[in-house]
Amino acid sequence: MGLLDRLSILLGLKKKEVHVLCLGLDNSGKTTIINKLKPSNAQSQNILPTIGFSIEKFKSSSLSFTVFDMSGQGRYRNLWEHYYKEGQAIIFVIDSSDRLRMVVAKEELDTLLNHPDIKHRRIPILFFANKMDLRDAVTSVKVSQLLCLENIKDKPWHICASDAIKGEGLQEGVDWLQDQIQTVKT
């Protein structure tokens, strides 16, 4: 990054660009969350399951996010690790209404946290306990317990209850992530 780029970021003329990985099991709401974070005129009305991955962009008050929306289908999860080095933050989405798959989500999270490209970095992780509007949803506190998030000691993390369709809880999460990215060296 050149001197003019740094100066324009400091003056607020240009936003710092960050690469974020959006991970989680299939049907957890990753694509819907990313879609809802985009400006309303850029939002898609028809959300389809992600095949492989897609790249989406949105902006916050001080950052420009490039999000790698990774498919959560079992056959595509092995692709995740190819993007770990580039990621400056992680959004991990959990379907809080699907108790049966919470064990699989925990296994995938453990695999992620123990990967050499993630393990020794203080990369911030934002968890969305999504689908809180559904009858069978458990609280974000319960999701945190089921995933044993309290054991994550070497990375900043935060969990937000969310309803991606209504957009509830999303801004709180993005605000936290923005603060972490600006203060944490990964």
From Swiss-Prot:
Transport keyword on record: yes
Protein's recorded name: ADP-ribosylation factor-like protein 6
GO molecular function ontology, one term from the record: phospholipid binding
InterPro entries named among the record's database cross-references: Arl6, P-loop_NTPase, Small_GTP-bd, Small_GTPase_ARF, Small_GTPase_ARF/SAR
Quaternary structure note: Interacts with SEC61B, ARL6IP1, ARL6IP2, ARL6IP3, ARL6IP4 ARL6IP5 and ARL6IP6. Interacts (GTP-bound form) with the BBSome a complex that contains BBS1, BBS2, BBS4, BBS5, BBS7, BBS8/TTC8, BBS9 and BBIP10. Interacts (GTP-free form) with IFT27.
Mode of membrane association: Peripheral membrane protein
Chain residues that bind Mg(2+): 50
Keyword Cytoplasm: yes
Compartments where located: Cell projection, Cilium membrane; Cytoplasm, Cytoskeleton, Cilium axoneme; Cytoplasm, Cytoskeleton, Cilium basal body
Listed GO CC annotations: axonemal microtubule; axoneme; ciliary membrane; cytosol; membrane coat; nucleoplasm
Residues involved in GTP binding: 24-31, 50, 69-73, 130-133, 164
Keywords: Cell membrane, Cell projection, Cilium biogenesis/degradation, Cytoplasm, Cytoskeleton, GTP-binding, Lipoprotein, Magnesium, Membrane, Metal-binding, Myristate, Nucleotide-binding, Protein transport, Transport
Gene Ontology biological process: brain development; cilium assembly; fat cell differentiation; protein localization to non-motile cilium; protein polymerization; protein targeting to membrane; protein transport from ciliary membrane to plasma membrane; regulation of smoothened signaling pathway
Role, per record: Involved in membrane protein trafficking at the base of the ciliary organelle. Mediates recruitment onto plasma membrane of the BBSome complex which would constitute a coat complex required for sorting of specific membrane proteins to the primary cilia. Together with the BBSome complex and LTZL1, controls SMO ciliary trafficking and contributes to the sonic hedgehog (SHH) pathway regulation. May regulate cilia assembly and disassembly and subsequent ciliary signaling events such as the Wnt signaling cascade. Isoform 2 may be required for proper retinal function and organization.
Family listed: Belongs to the small GTPase superfamily. Arf family.
SUPFAM superfamilies: P-loop containing nucleoside triphosphate hydrolases
CDD domains named among the record's database cross-references: Arl6
Domain of life: Eukaryota
Lipid attachment, kind N-myristoyl glycine: 2
